[in-house]
Amino acid sequence: MTLTRRRTLQLLAAAAPTLALRNTFAQTPPLTITPGPYTNIRAALHSYTTPDWFADAKFGIWAHWGPQSAIGAGDWYARLMYIEGTEQYDYHRKRFGPQSKVGYKDLIHLYTADRWDPEHLMDLYQRAGAKYFFSMGVHHDGYDLWNSRYQPRWNAVASGPRKDVVGIWAAAARARGLRFGVSEHLSNSFDWLAPSHLADTKGPYANIPYDGQDPAFADLYHDYTGMPANFAHTAQDMGRIAPGWWKLHYFNRVKDLIDQHQPDLLYTDGGIEFGSYGLGTVAELYNTGPYSYQNKSEAIFFSKTPNDCGPGTCVLDHERTVLNEIAPLPWQTDTCIGNWHYKLGITYKSPKKVVDMLVDIVSKNGNLLLNIPLPASGEPDAEELRILEAITQWTRINGEAIYSTRPWKIHGEGPSTKVVIHTDPTRFDPNEDRQPDLTAQDIRFTTKGKTLYAFAMGWPAQQTSKPAELVIQSLATNSPQAPGKPIDIRLLGRYDEPLRFTQDTTGLRITLPATPTPASNLGIALRINFA
């Protein structure tokens, strides 16, 4: 394409916001953190301790929702649509046309939220037992879901649904007493969007640039001026290679999210990145977030890097994986019922799988953050609603054994405790959705005060005409874990019926009622008190 003088002036005008951004940051003091006890020096964060409210909460729900969800083709669409040979590339070509003519920016209008009812959804989430809720703040695609000061064109108020999605979610959550969190996935956006700066390598559109190369859209796809000539070809999806001006932009943008919406929790998709800039986001959260009567920060920052989170500093998050044993400090698993972004035709996790994960994680001192992705409209599909209803029915009966509990001496017994689980918090567990469902032989424990709760992850099989019997070997008279002699055992959901039991060297044998409790196929919980 021949550049005329008029076209050159048009491109320079379009690029002006990004050029101004770079020049502004070049003249700006490195960081401006709200004054408080925390700074962007790592040692200053070591006084942080995880607040009790998080250890009590146990279960949160996340709406991983934005323009990429609106397309209905699953995860990482804004990147993979530009990579030849991927499912998303082929999908895009068939549905929208060649990437050199229709780019990601041209799809943002599909994110309509035209059937989004946040008040109703938050009622559903609260009834399902969630004690905290997460909104997407910004994903790797660089599209902000609030009225962003540092992304004025590509945000949910200026385009797409034309609503402050984060602010509306926050108001709905807080009105119901739920703690409110936001997620930011921005730290790797600079190189994650590199494929948008490429072109087809073959076919009728070979060598025709994708829209990431157009300076008019550098505020979305990033300005690679000054980067190595082959940067777009070599950049890795999680490389987090970015110039200094962009790292400061990252800090200011996340700070803007924090300052506008005062979240109780901030999830970062990775670790504390970019040295003092990442540490500055943690300090900003803790200095501006909620405080207890003891003047301790009650905010939570999540990192997936173990070295970030001890001593103090933050809570360790495990994406799509869990721990094998009890951890000394509270932690979190974040996972989803399907893809992170909404995908048509996908098979979701069953309610049984969700409850299995929740109970297992809580028994090990963890919390479960469960993503239920929303489509373009903002209205869950019928299967998502069915899953929510099943979880609701189960937590109504068994929530006493989940919330405000702490781990026991051991997390459980049974066949599943002998399975070694992949536990690297920086990597997905490829077998997360392939693990067999837990059964009545799989026992998990929690405690609250002097009360022990024992979960059996199913209703025990009934032998002939005899009532079903549950045997807990860890509570045998000669077990090193046994607290003593039980004096009262109740099945949650049947509080008025003390259960018959015997205890010997083979275990605690509990006779269950003739009729199972509702949702017992997902798991049951027993309240056990000792002399």
Model-derived regions: residue spans:
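Secretory targeting signals
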Residues: 1-3
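N-terminal export signals
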Residues: 7-26
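Mature catalytic domains of secreted/periplasmic carbohydrate-active enzymes
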Residues: 27-531
